Every structure is written in C-alpha cells, then in structure tokens.
C-alpha cells in the first residue's frame, strides 16, 4: 500500500493564483504557521498577485516574504475604493508583519458651535452631525483651545454649559473681563449675537477680511445713528481682530484648508509629520511613527519614503476629513489610491510636490519637524530598548521579538472600601500605551478586600484571553506582595494560563523606590534588583503609572457618588427628580445654593418638598 503524498503548499498557492479573477479585491498571505504576513489591495487580483511569484523579484525583502507564503486568501470587492477600505481595516486589526502600520490615534478634536438660540462654543471629539457647526479637525487639543480663546476675545461667544446658562441671574466673570457678551442675562440681543456667531464662523473658514469689512460697516452705521456706546463695542472687536491677524505669523495668502505632509526615514524608522492649515490659519503639526518600516516591500523604482507616504494617506484619510489640497515632500504615483480617497470624501484632492512661496516654507518647516521628531525618537528608543532588554534579562524571559515585549500591570485603589476600582496599564513597544489602559469597577465584594478585587479584575481581564480572544502579555505585573500574587496564581490556574508570567512587586521599607522585591509563584526565589537597576526603574515606572491611573479613576467615581448621595437620602427624591435638580442647577453645589423658591420652580418639586430639600442640605 503506497504512502499518501502530502500536497506541496507552494503548488497549492500557485494553483490558487492561476484561478484568481481579473477583479478588484484584497489579498492576504500566510506562512506555514498560519501567521499573517501581508495584506494588499488590487484593481486586478490575478495580475497583482501573480507579480509576486515571478522569478526575478526586484526587492530582496519581497523575495524573502514570498518564500514564506504557504497560503493565500482573497476577497473580491465591487471597486478599488471598497478594496482600499477593507485593506486598511484588516491592516489596523490584524497588524501583518510586512505592512507599514500606523497605530490608531485618538480622534482629532473639533471646535463646535451649537445650533441653539444662543449658540455655545465648545471643544469636541467624536462623530459630527448636521445639528451643529464643526470646524477642524485640529492637530491637537491645544490648537482648538487657542482658537476658542481668540473667538472669546474677538466675538465674545459663550462657552458655559446649558444648565449654567439657563439659570444665571447675573453675568459671570468672563463678561467682566470682556470674554463673553452675557447672552444668559439678555445683555445682547439674539440678532446681534447671531451676527457675532456668523462672523466667528467666517473667521474660522478663513474669511477674515470679509469679517473686518462687516464690522467696520457696522461701527460706522452705529456712529451715524449716534449710538456711540455700541460703536465703541464694535471698535473693540475690530481692534481685537486686527491684533490677532497681526500675530498670525503664518499668512496663507488666501488658502483655506491644506494638509502638509513630510516623511523622513532613518535608522530603520520613519516619521510622518502632518501640519494643518484650517481656515487660512496654520494650526501646528503632529508626528506619527509607523511600525514595520524595516520590513517594507519596496520595488526597485520606489523608495521606502514613498511607501510610507502611501500607507499614511491610505490609513489616515480613509475615515477622516481630507482637505482639498495636500502638499507632500515625497512624490507618489498612485492614481487608484487618490481616486478611492476622492470617492470616500466626495471632492477633488489636489497633490502638490513642488510648492512655491509660503507653501514652500510650510513644507520645509514640516520636514524639519519630522527630522527633529525622528532624531528624538531614535535617541529615546535607544535608551528605552536598553531598559526593556535589562528587564527581560533580569526576569530571565525568553522573548522572540523584543519590539513586541508586552507588560500588563494591575493595581487596586479605594478609600476605606469606597469606590473600589482596578486599573490595568500596558507597556508595549518600549513605551506606555495610554490607548490600551482600562479601568474596572469592582462590585459585590467586602469593602476593602483587595484580594477579592484583584481576583475579580484578573478573571475579567484574562477569561477572554484563555478562550482565545485577546493578547496574552509576556509579564503580568501585580502591585502587591505574596497575598496578591497568590490570588493571581489561583486565577491563572483556574483559567489554565502560564503562572510563570506573574510577577509581584512588594514595596520596600518606607515604600522607597529601589527597595522593592520581586515575588514569583513558579518556584523562583524573591529577587531584589537594587536601586541602580534599570530593570527596576522600568518596573517602578509601570507600577507607578498603574497606581496613578487607578487613583484618578477612583477619585472620579467617589466624587460622582458623593454628588448624588446627599440627594438620594432625601425622601421623595427619586432618580428622575434628582436628575432634573442637577440639570437645572448645574450640579449639587447649585442645588445647595438654591432658595426654596428656586427649588419649587423645578418641575415635579412641590413647595413642601422644596422646603424638605432645603432643610436636608443646610
């Protein structure tokens, strides 16, 4: 009886390639261990995928990856734009080894002007709607707040919460320092306030000259009507706006919305510096540092910088605002990519590679910013990598990829058993990863039982991981001694996880940094690294960050509980009435300051109940 022949994986792959359709779609390469190597998109799947299996590949890195391909998957899409969207979702979710990856950042902030009778100006992150006006996006929260300060100085728009606005009886401090026109107490008519809002919107859209002309005409009209007080107020607006325009060192020469993007590659890393011009004002920049740059599959005629630029355009703009003009320091020839992006945003995008005048200065500044940011990263990275390596060596951990070394640290925080919270912070890629931090509200335990709290958070965190859903870290750091570590061991045994990953950090005498002892549960003896140890300094940094994160969450939870608890103790005050009181008076402090008459004016609050509330709170 003859042996059954094992199919050749390469033959299966080539057979799959031969049967691919000439349609747009996304392809995925896997190695023999089912690890995802690469995700790509194509206008013609058969033509694009076949090009990887030619005998003479231009790039050695591409040839190295192709040798590892043991399986191929494809997904057919209706268009290349749809393929682009799917490709980037897969890259962000699955993080293939040979794709350049830009980590998801927090959403960009906007400046929002609400659509109310007297609109409010506010800092905003999140999805936009059609009920309000949104300006941006801005590269940083600081840029939004600076713009808000300008609008306060020039147009005196309100920033107060609606609950505060609805219940004021006299102007606040902002009116006294000429930062608000006090619409809350009718110091300005709805028509005049609407005009200020309209001028503010024009200013943000880059129509500053038009705003100045409108204000000057308004001032002259008041003067002709002998309304000198109103004319003086408009004159003050004109002076404030003129000062702002004079201070704007970045004169756009009429441009409205532009993004300037500079890519620098050095030392196996890359920096993409994105500068933003919105409404004709240069708002600053933000640096991005993609990973997997050293695995870029470059073709002979394409540079690594061009590949990074293409990856940034695809991953960054696929779900974000795209201005009509992009100024780039690296030339790319990707008509399909730009067509897909234009289909996504619904307008034409103009690419400029050789700008002139002020635009050239912007690009040079963006490029210089990228160079400085990358130099700083490489310097810090050398130090960070050294500390990471020292920690790995001190714990005698066998780590395949030091870049992927991951630590998760847990801490419990409460005040005499009240508002117990657990925190989990993450150290990955040689740095703390704020976006992966998590807080856990701890319930159904005896107040002050830290062991039960630790058990609950570890079970909630790693039960999914044990079932194959999630990432297991290389080290699980527990802020505590033998008791906490033993509780962690019990959880890991129940879940069938490796107990050698658990490391406890027992505080030293006087809780001084450098005197900590590392505690293990797999038979290793306790270890004191010494206060000069770089590994211990890294452990202390991670542990302290977990402690800080837990305390801030606990304090917020405690404050929220205390804000409502005094009202909850009053008979006749249920959830709905409590909510109405807090909304009407802007919080518990406002309820305490309210008179019996004010309290009884709230819907659902009788005179007798108002008197009861007043007595209970005083």
Curated annotation (Swiss-Prot):
Summary of subunit composition and partner proteins: Interacts with UvrB in an incision complex.
This protein's UniProt keywords: Cytoplasm, DNA damage, DNA excision, DNA repair, Excision nuclease, SOS response
Major site of localization recorded for this protein: cytoplasm
Ranges that cross the membrane: none
GO CC term (a single one): excinuclease repair complex
Organism of this sequence: Herminiimonas arsenicoxydans
One term of GO molecular function: DNA binding
Subcellular location: Cytoplasm
NCBIfam families: uvrC
All residue ranges annotated as the GIY-YIG domain in the record: 22-100
InterPro entries: GIY-YIG_endonuc, GIY-YIG_endonuc_sf, GIY-YIG_UvrC_Cho, Hlx-hairpin-Hlx_DNA-bd_motif, RuvA_2-like, UVR_dom, UVR_dom_sf, UvrABC_protein_C
Occurrences of domain UVR (ranges): 209-244
Source organism, top-level taxon: Bacteria
GO biological process, alphabetically ordered: nucleotide-excision repair; SOS response
Job description of the protein: The UvrABC repair system catalyzes the recognition and processing of DNA lesions. UvrC both incises the 5' and 3' sides of the lesion. The N-terminal half is responsible for the 3' incision and the C-terminal half is responsible for the 5' incision.
Cytoplasm is among the record's keywords: yes
Protein name: UvrABC system protein C
Family: Belongs to the UvrC family.
